[in-house]
Amino acid sequence: MEYRMKSLVALTAALTCTLALQGCTTHLAEGQKRELAIYEEKGLLVKEKSVGTAAVLGIFPGAGYFYTGHYVLGVTTLPLYPFLGPLWMPFDAAASAKSRNYYATKMEAERNKARELRELDHRLEDKQLSYEQHIREQRTIEAKYAAY
């Protein structure tokens, strides 16, 4: 009877820790996932980190976090690794790679959009375009880099 009680307490503690640590993951919000899918459809996706590689490295203590650039998490989660690491680290490292790719894609899209708009403005200033052509091309550029 005492053995069953200890087993039940251990199982409950493990379940509680697993559920509590789910909040430590670095997932994208639903809106960000939609944006990333749209960028991918438009061919603008930047793959800074491989999601598969991050997941595989997540099996090893801290490796997935180091790969995705989360060095502090890589070090601070080492004490937890023997207990719960193999359960959540591969998933969290993969989600972290997706997050990294999302922000890299967003930055690259903004940078390219700004560059193209600057070039367009220079063409207007040099009288190579009429104001109407400028507006039309500006809308085309904005639609190209929009995440909707």
Predicted features and spans:
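Hydrophobic alpha-helical transmembrane segments
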Residues: 12, 52-56, 74-78
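Short, functionally important structural connectors and interaction interfaces within domains
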Residues: 13-16, 58, 121
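Helical anchoring/docking segments at protein termini
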Residues: 2-3, 7, 29, 35, ...
